[in-house]
């Protein structure tokens, strides 16, 4: 709760409340954000499917779903879209995988090699 309040105070000080999304894999953190700072956009970082990422994202009012790339299927992406989620995938470092996920229609990629992603995805 203390961390959430610190984030909220900093965001207010710098007039960033409407420009940030706090992401976490912790349901405790997402719960605290929901309770203490509902005006801050939230995102779920999902690494496993044993807790349905779409259900958890909905439960905590998330607007973003950051999926481990291995969890990103066309079906899951379509369901996330219907739920109104921005879908980001991580960590995507191989050009062929970047292209495949972009072709699926993900909203963003998280990579250790941004220049590689730009050159890969700018090619027709």
Could you say what each language-model-derived stretch is?
Residues 1-124:
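Short loop-to-alpha-helix "cap/lid" segments that border enzyme active sites
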């Amino acid at each position: 709760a203390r961390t959430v309040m610190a984030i909220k105070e900093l965001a207010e000080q710098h007039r960033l409340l409407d420009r940030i999304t706090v992401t976490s894999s912790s349901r405790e953190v997402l719960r605290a954000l929901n309770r203490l700072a509902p005006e801050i956009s939230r995102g779920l970082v999902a690494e496993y499917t044993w807790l349905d990422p779409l259900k958890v994202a909905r439960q905590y009012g998330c607007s973003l779903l950051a999926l481990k790339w291995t969890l990103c299927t066309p079906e899951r992406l379509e369901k996330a879209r219907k739920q109104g989620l921005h879908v980001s995938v991580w960590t995507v470092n191989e050009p062929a995988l970047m292209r495949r996920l972009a072709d699926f229609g993900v909203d963003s990629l998280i990579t250790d090699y941004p220049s590689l992603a730009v050159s890969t995805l700018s090619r027709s």
